[in-house]
């Protein structure tokens, strides 16, 4: 009997089921469970009409029961030394309220240390200030962000980057398969010169970031660091590009700013990447073998002329560069349909599927002429229309 019980426990753990995890389906239960700490499994979308701040003082591991679940109008404030992890959550703010400030994860200035911050398989959007903000000199040994899309941030205050760490003392920051899209204040900002950082980005895409209106003050750098000669910065297979203007794809000058430290940049595509005042250029591993000139873009594909002509595996899986095409996928753009604020309308009987920008299907109807999208939350989506005679088209749209 003891062996049988042990075997069952092993199966539960292998399957990802955590013992003593609290499963929640309402915002009230979610708030109580998260404040209590421990493993919190979210089984349903969390509907919440007003901005709600949740104070965190204990280790907490938040995850979706399956796939991804929505979390509306939630603001986390970390107020003691904890490990914070969030996985499989679509976090956004639908409320028009101006206060409190729309920051997904906020660390007040008086917090001495936060042991770790982990974000995985998430989508974050419509936080008008930041995705993550640290106001003081908080020690943060590790930050990890993986398989995540961050978009439409900083619209209320473009002086803030999506990740705004100011003087926080971060030792290691790792980003893998992440897309930053329309983050007006830039991507990552640190002004701490005292702590050497091991900073790594692999398969990360920056699209239309760091180009807030000239009238706004603040950093326009995509990535910004203060001087520290012992720091190490690695960018591998990354795509950094500019903005959309009248559906034209224009690379803008983007900056990676660090006055000292060692940069390793390999197989990454950008236009006019400026790395300022490297400590010892003779020993830097700084390779930029790729150059690009922009052509045009529509919302189905982005065509870029590159040198060399074919390059592989650059950027996140959500917006990546393969050959000379970057975008969602190459399709036969022959089916005719249009998108209004409330529906997708096809001229032929079709199968219509709506995807989140991460690629997750969120709506589908078969053998129809139209599909209502009125219930979708604000955000970026893709629509695929496939007719019965094999014609297929994909378009991107922004639900406002």
Give each language-model segment a name.
Residues 37, 59, 81, 378-379:
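Beta-strand-connecting loops/turns
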Residues 51-52, 71-77, 93-111, 125-139, ...:
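Extracellular beta-strand/beta-solenoid scaffold signature
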Residues 64-66, 82-93, 113-126, 139-154, ...:
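Right-handed parallel beta-helix
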Residues 238, 257-331:
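Acidic, glycine- and Ser/Thr-rich low-complexity intrinsically disordered tracts
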Residues 25-31, 37-60, 66-75:
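N-terminal extracellular ligand-recognition/capping segment immediately after the signal peptide
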Residues 1-23:
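Bacterial Sec-dependent N-terminal signal peptides
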Residues 24-26, 276, 328, 339:
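Disulfide-bonded cysteine-rich modules in secreted/extracellular proteins
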Residues 331-400:
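C-terminal outer-membrane/trafficking sorting elements
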């Amino acid at each position: 009997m003891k062996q049988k019980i042990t075997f069952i426990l092993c199966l539960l753990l292998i399957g990802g089921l955590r013992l003593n995890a609290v499963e929640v389906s309402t915002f009230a239960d979610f708030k109580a469970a998260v404040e209590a700490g421990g493993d919190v499994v979210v089984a349903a979308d969390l509907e919440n009409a007003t901005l709600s701040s949740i104070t965190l003082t204990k280790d907490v591991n938040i995850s979706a029961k399956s796939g991804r679940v929505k979390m509306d109008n939630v603001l986390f404030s970390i107020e003691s030394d904890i490990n914070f992890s969030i996985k499989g959550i679509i976090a956004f703010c639908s409320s028009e309220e101006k206060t409190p400030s729309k920051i997904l994860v906020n660390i007040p200035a008086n917090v001495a240390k936060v042991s770790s911050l982990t974000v995985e398989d998430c989508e974050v959007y419509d936080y008008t200030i930041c995705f993550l903000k640290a106001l003081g000199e908080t020690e943060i040994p590790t930050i990890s962000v993986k398989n995540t899309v961050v978009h439409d941030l900083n619209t209320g205050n473009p002086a803030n980057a999506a990740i705004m760490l100011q003087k926080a003392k971060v030792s290691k920051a790792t980003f893998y398969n992440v897309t930053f899209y329309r983050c007006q204040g830039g991507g990552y900002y640190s002004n701490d010169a005292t702590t050497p950082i091991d900073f790594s980005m692999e398969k990360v895409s920056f699209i239309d970031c760091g180009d807030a209106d000239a009238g706004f003050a603040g950093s326009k750098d995509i990535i910004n660091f203060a001087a520290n000669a012992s720091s190490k910065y690695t960018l591998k297979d990354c795509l950094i590009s500019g903005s959309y203007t009248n559906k034209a794809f224009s690379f803008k000058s983007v900056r990676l700013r660090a006055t000292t430290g060692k940069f390793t940049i390999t197989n990454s595509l950008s236009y006019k990447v400026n790395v300022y005042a490297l400590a010892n250029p003779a020993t830097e591993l700084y390779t930029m073998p790729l150059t690009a000139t922009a052509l045009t873009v529509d919302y189905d594909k982005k065509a870029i002329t590159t040198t060399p002509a074919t390059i592989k595996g650059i950027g996140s899986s959500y917006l990546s560069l393969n050959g000379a095409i970057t975008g969602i996928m190459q399709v036969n753009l022959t089916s005719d349909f249009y998108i209004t604020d409330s529906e997708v309308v096809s001229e032929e009987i079709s199968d219509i599927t709506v995807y989140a920008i991460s690629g997750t299907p969120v709506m589908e109807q078969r053998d129809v002429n139209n599909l209502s999208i009125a219930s979708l939350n604000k955000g970026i989506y893709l629509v695929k229309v496939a007719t019965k005679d094999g014609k297929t088209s994909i378009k991107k749209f922004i639900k406002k």
